[in-house]
Amino acid sequence: IKIHKTIKNFHNDFLIFFNFFYMIKKSMADKLIVSFEEYIKIVEKLAIEIHKNYKPTVLVGIMRGAAPIIDILSRILKLPIAYIVIQSYIGKGLEDQQGQLMFAREISSLAKEKDFEKILLIDDLSDTGLTLNKSIEWLKGYEPTKRFIKEIKTACLWKKKSSSFEPDFCPIKLDSDPWIVQPTEHYEELSIEEIIKRN
């Protein structure tokens, strides 16, 4: 009986360990960790794709994800920039399940109104597609510039498999839905005190 219990306990312990190991492995597999070098390379590929296929008159970035992308693209393509700020009503990230997004009242930009003729709307990724779809709707109804808009095209660095939105320009189309860990994301877990200590 003791031997039977020992074997049974060992079997249970093994199953617990195996499940734990599987969960860790799956968690790691579900992440796409992107280095600074990889990130810059993807942005450069996006710039080439845009240069070959479209002549926008202004770049509009969705904050915060598009901030570094639009900075680089504006320097390469020599175009004016604008920003729109969005958050979900529940404050838990941009794309909640109900699709409730809250837009800032104004676009932040030094671009002239007439520059909004051919817009390239930029985000870091197409996750569900909700943010890009809603942003297009919002831009079309934005009073100061809507009469100048003739065309809106979209660009992002990654498109996830389950996204319902197909961006016009996108260098990386994924065959899964990983959590994309971008180069600056670790700063969200660091306090200013920790940064001071290591500097």
Descriptions of predicted regions:
Residues 11, 19-199:
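PRPP-associated nucleotide enzymes
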